[in-house]
Amino acid sequence: MAKLHDYYKDEVVNKLMTEFNYNSVMQVPRVEKITLNMGVGEAIADKKLLDNAAADLTAISGQKPLITKARKSVAGFKIRQGYPIGCKVTLRGERMWEFFERLITIAVPRIRDFRGLSAKSFDGRGNYSMGVREQIIFPEIDYDKVDRVRGLDITITTTAKSDEEGRALLAAFDFPFRK
């Protein structure tokens, strides 16, 4: 079992129960899933770019990504409905906790000019979204084999009812918020 999951059960639950005066352990917010999304708009011209992006996402997450397709045609972007334009992975359970631990301890500190993550990126329901400009911050990606630097979106979905509860949950994991 991931260390962070044990830490959540042993420390975070008790801390949040006293902070928010919950009656039951089941009321305490928890991390439900982590979604990684990589939009590859250039895949319209070159299909190989999408394969490389999917390989990067597989290395980062340890799970095969789902190829996302355009929902509707947009002439300005030169895409048609059904064109493959990106890939995404939804992590749950053990893989989610392992990725979350790597994200906090290894990947985020490797971001260039890092001063902390914005605490305003919550969606109103306790879920946190962040963008990463380059995939090379993850140790699984070999810098020499990268054909193109791509960014990705990371969404941490929690069972929190409000942004305040979600922020407290992530802060309990020492999430590096900007002061």
Swiss-Prot record:
Does Transmembrane helix appear among the keywords? no
Gene3D superfamilies hit by this protein: 3.30.1440.10
Alphabetized, the UniProt keywords read: Ribonucleoprotein, Ribosomal protein, RNA-binding, rRNA-binding, tRNA-binding
Read off the SUPFAM superfamilies from this record. RL5-like
Q: Which domain of life is it from?
A: Bacteria
This protein's GO CC annotations: cytosolic large ribosomal subunit
| Gene Ontology MF terms in the entry | RNA binding; rRNA binding; structural constituent of ribosome; tRNA binding
Q: Pfam families in the record, alphabetically? A: Ribosomal_L5, Ribosomal_L5_C
Provide the family line.
Belongs to the universal ribosomal protein uL5 family.
Assembly and partners?
Part of the 50S ribosomal subunit; part of the 5S rRNA/L5/L18/L25 subcomplex. Contacts the 5S rRNA and the P site tRNA. Forms a bridge to the 30S subunit in the 70S ribosome.
Task performed by this protein: This is one of the proteins that bind and probably mediate the attachment of the 5S RNA into the large ribosomal subunit, where it forms part of the central protuberance. In the 70S ribosome it contacts protein S13 of the 30S subunit (bridge B1b), connecting the 2 subunits; this bridge is implicated in subunit movement. Contacts the P site tRNA; the 5S rRNA and some of its associated proteins might help stabilize positioning of ribosome-bound tRNAs.
The protein's name is Large ribosomal subunit protein uL5
List the source organism.
Salmonella typhimurium (strain LT2 / SGSC1412 / ATCC 700720)
Q: What is the lineage of its organism?
A: Bacteria, Pseudomonadati, Pseudomonadota, Gammaproteobacteria, Enterobacterales
